[in-house]
């Protein structure tokens, strides 16, 4: 009997992008851990015989160590997706033209680094908008995977804003939709289709939207995250509880017919010695060996129940199958744009 499929994707957020989101001024120096990350990723992927999608930031692909990173993953067999050019978690504030320019600039950087034209996109910080979905369709993307259908994003944002006292008023305004909207909890937890009719904007006729969405899977019904960073952080308090949590999440996925999409991050494979200054990030005080053990458990648990594929294959698998549809206008809820809000 064939196993149902599940997909795995890693958002290749670099050292500087974490510092930028946190508001650290020295992010402009663009510190990078890509050489170390490359080795850790391929070692882990090889161990578990998986070839995930890796969503790469365009500015990193264009940096000195970017081509080696992209080429190593491409040669290994990973799908390379787009994660925007500047990793702005306030991408929803961009105008339609700025979004097209950002996406095209990223495509050019990824292809110059040795990857094919990206087929899929994940927004940094789950910063979605109706204009973003239209831009993805205009540029012929096959799928998006930016939805995290949870209520916990606004809670995490409030904690982040309360504990980060150094942010300016402008920086706080930029981050007011960080980690998504409360309304996102009402979006499907299974793949669905974004839809919208054609329309005219600034004298341009924009095509109708029909775009596959593969959400980052959350715990069915409870709608809390299950991606690796959360489970690894939980294991810092109790390994048995973390293992029970992931087992329960997979049991609920099976019961609800959810073919999950698991999100990984670089910091799942790194510790504080690899990225000094990121101690604020949950789990960065854990020894690398402990993190690797928990990640191994997560990947093994998924592999026992599912055939692990990349996001492109997951998106392709639902073509021709009736799925839910959502209008792109729902992405405006909780992400109201302030035209005066500056972008850094």
Predicted region positions:
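C-terminal domain-boundary segment and adjacent tail
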Residues: 47-49, 233-344
């Amino acid at each position: 009997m064939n196993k149902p499929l599940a997909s795995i994707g890693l958002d290749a957020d670099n050292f500087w992008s974490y510092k930028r989101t946190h508001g650290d001024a020295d992010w402009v120096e663009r510190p990078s851990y890509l050489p170390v990350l490359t080795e850790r990723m391929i070692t882990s992927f090889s161990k578990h015989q998986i070839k995930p999608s890796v969503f790469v930031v365009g500015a990193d692909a264009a940096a000195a160590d970017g081509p080696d990173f992209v080429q190593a993953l491409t040669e290994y067999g990973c799908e390379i997706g787009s994660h925007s050019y500047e990793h702005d978690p306030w991408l929803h504030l961009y105008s339609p033209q700025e979004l097209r320019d950002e996406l095209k600039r990223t495509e050019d950087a990824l292809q110059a680094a040795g990857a094919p034209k990206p087929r899929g996109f994940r927004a940094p910080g789950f910063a979605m908008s109706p204009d973003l979905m239209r831009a993805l369709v205009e540029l012929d993307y096959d799928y998006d995977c930016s939805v995290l259908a949870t209520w916990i994003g606004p809670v995490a944002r409030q904690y982040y804003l309360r504990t980060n006292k150094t942010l300016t008023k402008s920086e706080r305004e930029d981050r007011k939709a960080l980690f998504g909207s409360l309304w996102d909890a009402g979006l499907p937890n299974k793949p669905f289709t974004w839809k919208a009719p054609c329309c005219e904007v600034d004298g341009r006729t924009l095509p109708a939207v029909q775009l596959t969405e593969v959400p980052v899977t959350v715990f069915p019904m409870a709608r809390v995250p299950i991606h690796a960073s959360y489970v690894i952080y939980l294991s810092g308090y109790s390994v048995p509880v973390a293992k029970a949590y992931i087992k329960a999440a997979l049991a609920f996925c099976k019961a609800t017919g959810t073919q999950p999409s698991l999100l990984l991050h670089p910091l799942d494979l790194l510790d504080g010695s690899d990225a000094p200054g990121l101690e604020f990030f949950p789990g960065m005080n854990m020894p690398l060996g402990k993190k690797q053990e928990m990640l191994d458990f997560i990947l093994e648990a998924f592999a026992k129940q599912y055939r692990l594929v990349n996001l492109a294959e997951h998106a392709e698998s639902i073509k021709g199958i009736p799925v839910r549809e959502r209008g792109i206008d729902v992405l405006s809820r909780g992400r109201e744009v302030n035209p005066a809000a500056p972008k850094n």
